[in-house]
């Protein structure tokens, strides 16, 4: 068997880099010389000194969401690979629920406008034979609803303009619940502009449901017995105490509606960017702008309105006052917001608003400069026109002066 050095000295085209790229070790077998040429077999042997570590491919995928504009749309959240098992026992909980120990239901959140008149909502719901409850005064109205044999709770959030249903499909919410309170919506959106968030939840309503989970890890069971929480992509509602369970649902509803309300502003921002992109491209190409100052002012007005809805006119950037005095509800609200990436999304939206505002200000400055240049030319033309008049008047005076007879001419005539 020949060494690598003798092989490379004979076959100059073989390099150590090429052999490394093959990922194998090469050896020469039965090498002999015939007719002045090397002949032999190259045997490939798999490397045994390299250990291939197994990679955990247990990666959580984003749940697909149906939207009227786009049949399938990813939720605005990010996932990272699960390279190790969680230590708090939540993986055990998810595995247990996947075996149909408890029924997994859908929690649908739909934002239909900027807000709801809750007093009018209660009147409309009462007219339909429902029994609304002012769960959180001036903030959330809740009522029980039944559709196609499914019974669940529905919450209307007045400040966010959102409806959160617990136990119903998206089509049921759109076709049955939203029309009931449509008249109470403030600045409603078009149907195709509704923003929707979908999550699964499990509700523990009695001791029997709790017993179904008694086989879980001891670290998880005590937590289920005392509070509601978020486990991965699954909401766990503890309704052993029905009143506390409704408050927990309200906290989850506030976090979910925060996401859909933010999604409305994100969509408005994307529409603005798509409108102004052609203008920016035309400027880069040196094309003459067919843009009026009023259009630029409307554009920057839209940006200020989006920024105001994000930072001033709503509680998107802060925790509602209600949850400050309720640590458990505050934890639920913050966990949902963290899971839906509310903080990073707000920062990204503010960055886009900053850039777009600077862009609009540059356009307004450009238009003002163009208008000032136009006015300067008008002034120049007026000065030139006035100068022509002055020259003409001077010529007339000079001509009349030259045509008048002088004293010498008068003496000569005498």
UniProtKB/Swiss-Prot annotation:
A single BP term in Gene Ontology: positive regulation of mitochondrial translation
Spans within the Mitochondrial matrix topological domain: 30-373
UniProt keyword list: Membrane, Mitochondrion, Mitochondrion inner membrane, Transit peptide, Transmembrane, Transmembrane helix
Location within or outside the cell: Mitochondrion inner membrane
Transmembrane spans: 374-394
Ranges of the Mitochondrial intermembrane topological domain: 395-414
GO cellular component, one term: mitochondrial inner membrane
Membrane topology field: Single-pass membrane protein
Transit peptide per record: 1-29
Pfam family, one: DUF155
Function: Component of MIOREX complexes, large expressome-like assemblies of ribosomes with factors involved in all the steps of post-transcriptional gene expression.
Subunit-structure text: Associates with the mitochondrial ribosome.
Membership in a protein family: Belongs to the RMD1/sif2 family.
Protein name: MIOREX complex component 10
Organism, as annotated: Saccharomyces cerevisiae (strain ATCC 204508 / S288c) (Baker's yeast)
Gene name for this UniProt entry: MRX10
